[in-house]
């Protein structure tokens, strides 16, 4: 047993300069855990509630002192003395203490900070790296990095409709080789854009954010960059998209404002079909809005044997919503974000449910990040085979990629790179 001795929260800043929560948790055997909570720019309505202060005179209303107070004055007294290694009991207590379906009283950012801090303290107490503590001896698969090399949507100014254009370097023997390829394509893309007279400023997640005429133009430049870097599009490196369609969906009209026009779901489905035929796309995240269950089921039936359709806003890492998607055949892949559901235990439940039902899982960062590397360890621990954590730029993104390099080295000959097996769509390129 590693009894919790103290819990303390403070307000810090994330990668966008917005306040977030840091929690420090100490146990009686000298272990210490640090919980750093990320934050999203485009968020699903069904996500657990992120508690913000709302005082416009302080950090423009984005302060989190209320969440900090909830940890220090409400959660801490209840969890002191509990066993940090009993993650389920700790998380269940905080959920019960909150008493709402979406953690809408204490705040998911307060609860997750404590949940993560306890996880790290427990791993340190057990003298195990985090991936080994979570996954036991089974965790050994290094994930394919889905690298967001062009930013649009809510992550950039002058944006295209599509929020993230990612490369997926799956045609390699090791993670380190795949990372190298991704980095080389990223740097090559900068030169490709410069030659076209396009800006190479960066978006929230480190990808380039030039002003594009069409969504397809972004894909064409990425294809050029892959080839110019010496790699084969499709065979070695595929393309993944995060459309984030809820961001440009109008509830009143039931239409998507896309490419400058109001489009219905049939138009969007046809657009995706043509895109998949034209480019080596292996993954599309949030192709339809977060309550468009029937449209999700339709596209999964039409194209789900060719690529993965990843539910982010649709599932929000919530086992209840994921179960609905499984039953309806809506989507075939889960995006995993710890702060969408708000506890480590519920996150692990969602991954397990996805795996048991033949869904892939992609562990993800948020646009407002910290130097925390939990998602790297989590991806290996649960052998998810996929991670998305931005471009190979900006310290908070690089930290995750570097942590995976460390894990690969630690695992040695037992390390396995997910590669082609991570994606259904890759089969047609083998």
Curated annotation (Swiss-Prot):
Pathway field: Carbohydrate degradation; glycolysis; pyruvate from D-glyceraldehyde 3-phosphate: step 4/5
Binding site for (2R)-2-phosphoglycerate: 163, 337, 366-367, 388
First-level EC class: lyase
Pfam assignment, any one: Enolase_N
PANTHER family (alphabetical): ENOLASE
Family that this chain belongs to: Belongs to the enolase family.
Name of the protein: Enolase
Molecular functions per Gene Ontology: magnesium ion binding; phosphopyruvate hydratase activity
Residue sites binding Mg(2+) per the record: 242, 285, 312
Active site location: 205 (proton donor), 337 (proton acceptor)
Cofactor binding, note field: Binds a second Mg(2+) ion via substrate during catalysis.
Keywords: Cytoplasm, Glycolysis, Lyase, Magnesium, Metal-binding, Secreted
GO cellular component, one term: cell surface
Catalysed reactions, as listed in the record: (2R)-2-phosphoglycerate = phosphoenolpyruvate + H2O
GO BP: glycolytic process
EC number: 4.2.1.11
Necessary cofactors: Mg(2+)
CDD domains, alphabetized: enolase
Main localization, broad class: cytoplasm
Localisation: Cytoplasm; Secreted; Cell surface
Function: Catalyzes the reversible conversion of 2-phosphoglycerate (2-PG) into phosphoenolpyruvate (PEP). It is essential for the degradation of carbohydrates via glycolysis.
